[in-house]
C-alpha cells in the first residue's frame, strides 16, 4: 500500500490570516499549495461581484479541486488548501475528501477576535487595493454570520492558532 500525503486546511473568519498562514505552512512542509482565490480568479475573472457570486463559483470548482487534491495526495505529497472550512458543511466536504483519499488531515483553526480580523482586513485593503470593494466591514459581518466554530463531535484533527498575520505563529494544540 502506498503512503498518502496529508491534507492541511483552515478554519477562520475573514481576515484571520488563512492565506498568509497557508503560504508559510506550504513552504515549511514542502507541500503543494492550492488557493481558492487563485482558482476563482483564473477560471471566473471579473465575475465575482458579490458574496452570492462567490458561493456559486466556489461550488462549481469543488469537484475539480477534489479530484486534483486526491490525485496529489496519492503521490505521497502533502497538500495545503487555502480554502475555507468555516462551516460544518465545508468541514464535512474536507473530511469526505480525506476519507475517500485515505489520508490524514490537520485543520488549523485561526481563532482570532472580530477586532483582530477587521484590523487585518483594513491592512489588506491598503496592501491590495484591488480587494477594497470586497474587503469591507460590511462584507466581513455578512460572511461572519455564516461562521460556525468547529466542535469536538466533528472528529477533526484540530490545531488551534492565534496567528495574527505578521505577528507570527502562536499554536495551541
Would you name each region that the model predicts?
Residues 101-121:
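Conserved phosphate-donor/acceptor-positioning beta-strand/loop module used by diverse small-molecule
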Residues 57-101, 105:
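Glycine-rich phosphate-binding loop used to anchor ATP phosphates in small-molecule kinases
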Residues 10:
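Hydrophobic anchor at the beta1->P-loop junction of P-loop NTPases
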Residues 13-14:
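The conserved Walker
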Residues 20-77:
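Conserved substrate/cofactor phosphate-moiety recognition/catalytic segment
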Residues 1-4:
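Phosphate-binding P-loop
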Residues 17:
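Conserved glycine(s) of the Walker
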Residues 24, 115-173:
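Conserved GTP-binding G-domain of TRAFAC-class P-loop NTPases and closely related GTPase folds
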Amino acid at each position: 500500500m502506498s503512503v498518502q500525503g496529508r491534507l492541511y486546511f483552515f478554519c477562520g473568519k475573514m481576515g484571520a490570516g488563512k492565506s498568509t498562514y497557508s503560504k508559510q505552512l506550504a513552504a515549511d512542509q514542502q507541500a503543494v499549495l492550492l488557493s481558492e482565490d487563485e482558482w476563482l480568479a483564473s477560471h471566473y475573472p471579473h465575475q465575482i461581484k458579490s458574496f452570492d457570486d462567490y458561493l456559486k463559483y466556489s461550488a462549481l470548482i469543488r469537484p475539480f479541486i477534489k479530484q486534483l487534491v486526491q490525485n496529489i495526495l496519492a503521490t505521497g505529497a502533502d497538500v495545503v488548501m487555502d480554502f475555507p472550512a468555516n462551516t460544518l458543511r465545508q468541514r464535512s466536504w474536507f473530511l469526505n475528501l480525506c476519507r475517500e483519499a485515505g489520508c490524514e488531515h490537520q485543520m488549523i483553526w485561526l481563532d482570532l477576535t472580530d477586532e483582530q480580523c477587521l484590523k487585518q482586513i483594513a491592512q489588506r485593503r491598503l496592501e491590495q487595493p484591488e480587494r477594497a470593494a470586497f474587503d469591507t466591514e460590511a462584507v466581513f459581518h455578512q460572511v461572519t454570520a455564516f461562521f460556525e466554530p468547529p466542535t469536538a463531535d466533528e472528529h477533526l484533527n484540530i490545531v488551534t492558532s492565534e496567528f495574527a498575520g505578521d505577528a507570527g505563529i502562536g499554536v495551541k494544540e
